[in-house]
Amino acid sequence: MDDKTSKAAAAEKAKALAAALSQIEKQFGKGSIMRYGDNEVEHDIQVVSTGSLGLDIALGVGGLPRGRVIEVYGPESSGKTTLTLQVIAEMQKLGGTCAFVDAEHALDVQYASKLGVNLTDLLISQPDTGEQALEITDALVRSGSVDLIVIDSVAALVPKAEIEGEMGDSLPGLQARLMSQALRKLTATIKRTNCMVIFINQIRMKIGVMFGNPETTTGGNALKFYSSVRLDIRRIGAIKKGDEVVGNETRVKVVKNKVAPPFKQAEFDIMYGSGISREGEIIDLGVQANVVDKSGAWYSYSGNRIGQGKDNVREYLKEHKEMAIEIENKVRENQGIVSRAATFPASEAEDGE
């Protein structure tokens, strides 16, 4: 009898939980709650590669989701702008229209071009005030013809009142209110037009924090709530050739993820002048997935040796792009995420061209 009662009680609890989960999803949207162990993923969303295979895997869906707000934050020179420029390059390859709202007035167009960004088709705005930047963003989203907008950065979205005021004026909470109002307006339109909006953010230190993390991001709390994906990007080391530093070792942590389980991380190399070393990642992840065989210093693929030492294999894959994409798609298949060639429906990619 006790066993039957406990089973009935467990069934009731499970039923009540299912009803609560259904109510939460109805109220707050799909993906607002999920069982971590189920590894449930929204498969009907369109994604765009980040330019990093490891990060695409860590995101759980093969890239950044369209029709969502994304936040990328980290310390100075950690690779925030590089990562977003790589996403722009990937979106342009798929025929998408991209805009860069340069509130910091610091975009290096030569560097963007080296990362594969098509500057001819890129829309660039350098607004004078935070209100102007967010109004431009709103107009672009509402047009329904822009696929990706990057705002660099939240810290540089200075309210008009602050610009027109005196240098020592205290205007607490002005930027936070501006961000909160803008995101309330933007969110529904972003979802409807399937436009991805990436906010780059900076880190500040809270004063007087004795315990816990003293770091916080600028612009108040609104962006934390409205973001579907939040990425914390850090420089963890230098890549050297002899005594010369030629790149950064970078770690990205998925701090928040509404489309797949969060808290995963990826490590990759950002090479100066060329961006994320995709070939280096393909080699490492290919070996992990047993797609590429490693014996001593030699690497082999499909029974054929492709080079001795990682640097030589990296150069080989740069010259043989078809093989690199083939290995990458096998790794993606192994991880159960969308292949790079099939990130968009073909008809949509053609329409955008």
Curated annotation (Swiss-Prot):
Gene3D superfamilies: P-loop containing nucleotide triphosphate hydrolases. InterPro entries: AAA+_ATPase, DNA_recomb/repair_RecA, DNA_recomb/repair_RecA_CS, P-loop_NTPase, RecA-like_C, RecA-like_N, RecA_ATP-bd, RecA_C_sf. ATP binds at residues 74-81. The keyword Cell cycle does not apply. GO terms for cellular component: cytosol. The keyword DNA-binding applies. Keywords: ATP-binding, Cytoplasm, DNA damage, DNA recombination, DNA repair, DNA-binding, Nucleotide-binding, SOS response. GO terms for molecular function: ATP binding; ATP hydrolysis activity; ATP-dependent DNA damage sensor activity; damaged DNA binding; single-stranded DNA binding. GO terms for biological process: DNA recombination; DNA repair; SOS response. It is found in: Cytoplasm. Can catalyze the hydrolysis of ATP in the presence of single-stranded DNA, the ATP-dependent uptake of single-stranded DNA by duplex DNA, and the ATP-dependent hybridization of homologous single-stranded DNAs. It interacts with LexA causing its activation and leading to its autocatalytic cleavage. Belongs to the RecA family. PANTHER family: MITOCHONDRIAL DNA REPAIR PROTEIN RECA HOMOLOG-RELATED, RECA. NCBIfam families: tigrfam_recA. This is Protein RecA. It comes from Bordetella pertussis (strain Tohama I / ATCC BAA-589 / NCTC 13251). The lineage of its organism: Bacteria, Pseudomonadati, Pseudomonadota, Betaproteobacteria, Burkholderiales. The gene is recA.
